[in-house]
């Protein structure tokens, strides 16, 4: 989600358009970050407020129209800019669907204090819904914080990392997010809202929250939710816990934990550990260690639970990262109550220092995704998709790095014990200039495998302009290359062993260097897709549209949707 001091908004003056506005921080007592080095706080995925100054071939097949999901955006002082980090859940009829995203409008007013309207926003996690298969969308804002009074006694304000799922009943949507107390900014851990359609309207009915038993000594981040497709009572949430080490609050490098419900979300049980803190982190009390982040859960056909996540890079005590990382998985045979020993899926070259040049944050998450085939010739096959840099890179995150990255897939036919060698889902990439990343793997009812991903062509702009991006900490990434990004999909009919030619989903290319936003990261940390029947539904961040800011057309980052039949 947005970056650096988590949900801290630096105590510096931040310019919104031409207005100087104080960006507030959560207090040290509430966040526990006072003694944590800045480079280490940036391991977390939290959204931060951002200046809205300038940021600088395939047959379309059966791709449906590209539709903007969110309402038109307005610049300060009427609003704040930026809608990204997308997620989607779709009902069995393929017509009723809910999308979610990080929404910069949530920085207005309490608890963040940005000067804009309205002064009482609902949250940093927006949502929209459609009742006609995505032809039209209604922007719902964010879930009403006052829903929290009825279930947890406080107003629950979502603060990003949105993740949607739909229950096995095909009617109840679950929306997981990080959360804080609306009035005080106190950390609440994770929230899960439940909602449903009634006619042509959608509403959230209630919310539950859960947090580390050790309270502010630990910090929850990057949650993701999955539901059991065969039992509406069961769902799990995996997350990263930056836990206390050696008496130092929130000083760990990430432990992967899981919470579960067996009553449809009325109560949540946990946490249990799927990926223990890495031994080097524990041995050095978190002064140096190996990052664990970006977990995603999924249910198998027999009720088993799999969780995948990124392990690495390893950081020195001064914050210098290694170039290597790996993808791991853990399995539970009792619905998420306990997990076996984690298993390595594959080694990777971390993308941390190899982001698209138009990305407005100094570091980049690898973020693997997971699915399980529950039909077809390969029923029970577990699939994990992930990106990897073409070659290891340790270049400075302030420099433009044009080394290519690719999307790979591995699969397991023995419940995650052993894994196939990773192979590209969309062919090879050159050594420089093409970045494929943030894949989402989904499966169809007939057993096909679908992978949606971003592809960025890192090249000079036709007008010869530089890409000039603020990346936090007073730093900029400046250079001649731009990030020209499209959303694509590949499909496999043999269980992920081979894929057809890529299909371009986005009907217009986004220049990530041109998006004008009030959030960091400008395009989020992941994208969303779901497959129902044989149709894949995708939502992504897109900067094709412009609005007038002080009389000048400026690109803004919206959420776009399309289906692929």
Regions found by a protein language model. Give the residues of each.
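Bacterial N-terminal signal peptides that target proteins for export
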Residues: 1-10
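Bacterial N-terminal signal peptides
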Residues: 10-22
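Sec-dependent signal peptide cleavage junction
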Residues: 22-30
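C-terminal PAP-associated
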Residues: 29-565
């Amino acid at each position: 989600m947005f970056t650096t001091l988590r949900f801290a908004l630096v105590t510096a003056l931040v310019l919104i358009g031409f207005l100087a506005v104080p960006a507030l921080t959560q207090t040290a007592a509430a966040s526990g970050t006072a003694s944590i080095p800045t480079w280490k706080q940036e391991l977390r995925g939290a959204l931060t407020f951002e200046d809205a100054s300038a940021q600088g071939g395939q047959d379309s097949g059966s791709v449906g129209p590209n539709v903007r999901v969110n309402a038109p955006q307005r610049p300060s002082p009427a609003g704040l800019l930026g809608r990204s980090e997308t997620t989607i859940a779709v009902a069995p009829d393929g017509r009723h669907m809910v999308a979610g995203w990080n929404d910069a409008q949530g920085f207005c007013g309490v608890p963040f204090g940005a000067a804009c309207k309205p002064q009482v926003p609902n949250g940093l996690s927006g949502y929209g819904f459609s009742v006609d298969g995505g032809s039209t969308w209604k922007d719902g804002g964010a879930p009403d914080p006052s829903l929290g009074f009825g279930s947890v006694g406080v107003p629950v304000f979502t603060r990003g990392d949105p993740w949607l799922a739909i229950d096995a009943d095909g009617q109840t949507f679950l929306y997981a997010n990080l959360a804080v107390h609306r009035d005080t900014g106190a950390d609440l851990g994770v929230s899960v809202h439940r909602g449903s359609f009634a006619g042509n309207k959608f509403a959230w009915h209630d919310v539950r929250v859960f947090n580390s038993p050790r309270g502010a000594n630990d910090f929850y981040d990057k949650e993701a939710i999955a539901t059991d497709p065969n039992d509406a009572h069961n769902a799990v949430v995996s997350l990263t816990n930056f836990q206390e080490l050696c008496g130092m609050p929130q000083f760990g490098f990430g432990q992967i934990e899981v919470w579960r419900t067996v009553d449809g979300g009325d109560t949540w049980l946990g946490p249990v550990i799927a990926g223990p803190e890495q031994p080097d982190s524990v041995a050095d009390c978190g002064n140096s260690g190996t990052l664990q982040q970006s977990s995603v859960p999924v249910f198998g056909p027999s009720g088993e639970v799999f969780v995948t996540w990124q392990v690495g890079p390893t950081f020195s005590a001064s914050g210098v990262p290694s170039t290597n990382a790996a993808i791991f998985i853990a399995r539970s045979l009792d619905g998420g109550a306990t997990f076996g020993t984690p298993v390595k899926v594959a080694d990777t070259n971390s993308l941390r220092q190899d982001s698209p040049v138009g990305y407005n944050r100094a570091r980049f998450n690898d973020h693997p995704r997971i699915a399980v085939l529950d039909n077809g010739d390969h029923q029970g096959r577990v699939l994990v998709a992930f990106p990897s840099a073409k070659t290891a890179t340790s270049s400075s995150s302030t420099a433009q790095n044009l080394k290519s990255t690719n999307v790979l897939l591995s699969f397991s036919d023995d419940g995650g014990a052993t894994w196939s060698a990773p192979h590209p889902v969309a062919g090879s990439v050159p050594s420089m200039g093409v970045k494929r990343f943030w894949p989402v793997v989904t499966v169809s009812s007939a057993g096909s495998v679908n992978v949606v991903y971003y592809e960025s062509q890192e090249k000079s702009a036709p007008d010869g302009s530089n890409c000039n991006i603020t990346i936090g900490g007073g730093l900029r990434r400046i250079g001649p290359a731009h990030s020209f990004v499209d959303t694509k999909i590949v499909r496999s009919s043999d269980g992920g062993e081979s894929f057809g030619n890529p299909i371009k989903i986005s009907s217009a290319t986004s220049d990530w260097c041109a998006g004008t936003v009030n959030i960091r990261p400008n395009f989020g940390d992941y994208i969303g897709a779901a497959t129902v029947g044989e149709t894949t539904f995708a939502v992504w961040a897109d900067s094709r549209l412009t609005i007038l800011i002080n009389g000048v057309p400026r690109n803004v980052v919206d959420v776009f949707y399309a289906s692929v039949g």
